UniProtKB/Swiss-Prot annotation:
This is Nicotinamide-nucleotide adenylyltransferase. It catalyses: beta-nicotinamide D-ribonucleotide + ATP + H(+) = diphosphate + NAD(+). Gene3D superfamilies: HUPs (3.40.50.620). It holds the Pfam family CTP_transf_like.
Length: 187
């Protein structure tokens, strides 16, 4: 029976840190289950891309990295209930033997369920962060070098930068509306 590892992320967007981590994961197990977290979320500043877009990014990036197709992509909608989250994930994915994560809460939740947890190396977390990449997109700063070439091309194909800028503008306008004084109409 092949040894399977679980790796969960939101991938908003897929970046070079994800790929470096996945290269490590692939080197440790026979098959990898890649859980796509917050699968229900899209078109928000924190989660701008749809699940299918994130799946496409992963497929292209893993192919570009030369990683064998020894993986499953599984969407994982949020349940916002940490105490049972690891049980929920276990019910949503094929059998796995080990969990790879850089998130201390994820590590704790799976250890409590008796799983082996390996904290994979983190790569340039200061800039290889989806939050930083989205921020750079909004501010018009260079971001392409932080993601695989195939992901940068895909984001451009779907006009992802324009979407993120629009979401940021909408959020900024909403915040201004919330801070505006309330005017009671005169009758």
């Amino acid at each position: 029976m092949p040894k399977r590892g679980l790796f969960v992320g939101r991938f908003q967007p897929v970046h070079n840190g994800h790929i470096k981590a996945l290269e490590f994961v692939f080197s440790q197990v026979d098959e990898v289950i890649i859980g796509i977290g917050s699968a229900q979320a899209s078109h928000t500043l924190k989660n701008p891309f749809t699940t299918s877009e994130r799946m496409e990014m992963l497929i292209r990036a893993l192919d570009e990295a030369g990683l064998e197709k020894r993986y499953y992509l599984i969407p994982l909608p949020d349940i916002n209930f940490n105490a049972i989250w690891s049980t929920y994930v276990q019910s949503m994915v094929p059998r796995f033997d080990v969990v790879f994560t850089g998130n201390s809460l994820v590590a704790q939740l799976f250890r409590e369920r008796g799983y082996e947890v390996i904290v994979q190396p983190m790569f340039r977390k200061d800039i290889l962060s989806a939050t930083e990449i989205r921020k750079r997109m909004v501010e018009g700063e260079p971001w392409e070098e932080l993601v695989p070439k195939s992901v940068a091309e895909f984001i451009k194909e779907i006009k992802g930068v324009e979407r993120i800028k629009m979401l940021a503008t909408n959020l900024e306008n909403s915040e201004k509306e919330l801070q505006a004084p309330i005017r009671i109409p005169e009758f």
